[in-house]
Amino acid sequence: MKALTGIKVIDFSKWLPGHYCGMVLGDFGADVIKVETPAGDDTRRFFPEALPGMSYWHLALNRNKRGITADIKTEGGRKLLLRLLSEADVFLEGFRPGYLARYGLDYATVREINPQLVYCSITGFGQTGSYRHKPAHDLNVIGLAGLNSLDDVGSACAVSYTHLTL
């Protein structure tokens, strides 16, 4: 038996941080349900494709997950997601602050149907502050922090760091 056996995770994340988090939770035995929009997850279309419509990135980061499609812009899609969340232990989401509130899927609303739910919002700059609505990925944050200026291969004091390799 794995450490997270019996834990149900709803993964409605976007991009690497959320996909990776859900993957690790699944590796530890959690029942992870990946929710995709009707258009499918953007990572499906990354190059190179392992299979038609499935990139290596998508396959690697979504191992140990079951998948469903839900359109939160429709009442049926919202009801489906709320039903899943009512029975879940963890909710992973990776949208800008306030986006899910438009659809009644924000923390305050979801907490009413499942007070025990761990609601994990993954954003580039957090929920508060002047940058909260800005999109960000690793490269943006590294640049803003000034790390790129230290990554001079010819310099004796260059900083070495490794990007994620799957």
Q: What is each PLM-predicted segment?
A:
Residues 1-164:
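N-terminal helix-loop segment corresponding to the beta1-alpha1 unit
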